[in-house]
Amino acid sequence: MKTKNPFKTNTLQSVILCAVALGLLIGLVMTDSAFAQAAAPVVKEIVQSPAKAVLTPNSNIADQDKHKRYYTIPNFRLGGKYNLDAPPDTWRNGGEGGTTLESLGSGPLQVAYIAVGTPKRNAKGEIINGFIISTFYSGDSTWMYNTWYTKQPANAFSGGEIVGPGLAIDTNKYYVVFLDAIGLWGASKPSHGLGRKFPHYSYMDMVVANCRLLRDHLNIAQVEVATGVSMGATQTWIWGVMYSPSGYVKAIMPIGGTTASDGADPVGQWTFRLGTAAIESDPNWRATNGNYYHLPKGNHPNQGMQFMWSTLQLTGYTFPVRSATPWKTLQREVFYWEPKGEETATWIGRVKNEDAVDYWYRNNAGFNYNINNELKRIKARTLVVHVTNDLWLMVENARKAAAAVPGAAFATLSDPQAHYGVFRAPNVLKDTIKAFIDNTFTASLPGIGGASGGGGGGTAPAKPAGLSK
């Protein structure tokens, strides 16, 4: 959606608030040459999910949709349990006891991605320089591409370009894959038609399904680095737990994620419980118990979604930023059951392309998530990055998680955008992050608190042991 920019453009505050108002939904077209570099095995690709009507778009950024590619995985089990002591091949089809979409009358599980960069292959023709970027809570590959990839319209939100030739994530060196996640946009989701019959998926399901995409579809035999921001960082932690012991993933760099969002993280749990409660407070949800797909879009729980976004965004940015913003401007983001004029306008526009059941499931995936006891399994080089003034995911939890991984390094930054500072982190800590990616890391780089997040940069070893893995 497009809204009139009410701010001066030369202040940080205007960048922050206008980015939210705009939703960063303006895209440019990626050149064909970028995909010409991204060679992959030839498979049949699909445009939309099979057999089911799509109630929500396949891409967050419509203008980038043409670059998204799809892959289907038959008989993948969602919502099952994973035995982490078993070999990864035992997870190929999801967790034990899970439910397949086919058993519910749907088509097979769908995953989606955008790939750029330069594949390097071994003698078998397998790609051995994979670099994966998992998506965040409400995003997808088009959003991350539109924000991080070189010469895109939303680069300013992340403080400049991050992915491209010669950049921190160098497409001359790596074959970079932006990934969607099960539950929203181009991946299988409740709004493909199953609604509340859709299986309750987990973050582990997201990672295992995307690993199938990498191995079976893109023929990637080695992931050099896995990263992502927010929920993308949460998935990055899981990539480390599940796929670094075998050596498939060599390095992980979670930026602003969490290793637990159950009761072990009271603030995070509280924050997103409020979001779910907001959805469930909508009269249309209550009248249908969330089974409303037979109704016109105007009769869906759209106000519940607006309410959810309003509750989340209160703490999405620092309170000084919010307090310094005129009330008339903030009213666009404040929820009203009976809005007048510009009240709630930001969220009224946004939720036209979103679905309440999709987000109800997305929240639910986090409520029972906790891998704190599994962090010792990580064998990858590890750099944990976190925003110190994040009001959703507390920095101390990230510090403790880093300390649980032998040899991990911990880097921090402060940002007026609070949690949203995760998108800028690779530019704010450019030297640190590029050095980690290129495996030339030292503990005296900007933002580093030392190995495992403890101590000062001056007393830490030149290269923490874990970073030599």
Question: Which sequence ranges carry the predicted segments?
Answer:
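N-terminal cap/lid subdomain of alpha/beta-hydrolase-fold enzymes
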Residues: I114-H192
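Catalytic-loop region of hydrolases
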Residues: Q37-G130, L445-A451
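Catalytic histidine-centered segment of alpha/beta-hydrolase-like enzymes
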Residues: P416-N427
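Conserved alpha/beta-hydrolase "acid-adjacent" motif
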Residues: L391-N397
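Alpha/beta-hydrolase-fold enzymes
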Residues: Y248-G349
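Conserved hydrolase catalytic core segment
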Residues: E224-V225, S230-G263
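Short beta-strand/loop motif that positions the catalytic acidic residue
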Residues: I378, V384-H386
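Cap/lid segment of the alpha/beta-hydrolase catalytic domain
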Residues: L167-R212, D265-R286, N291
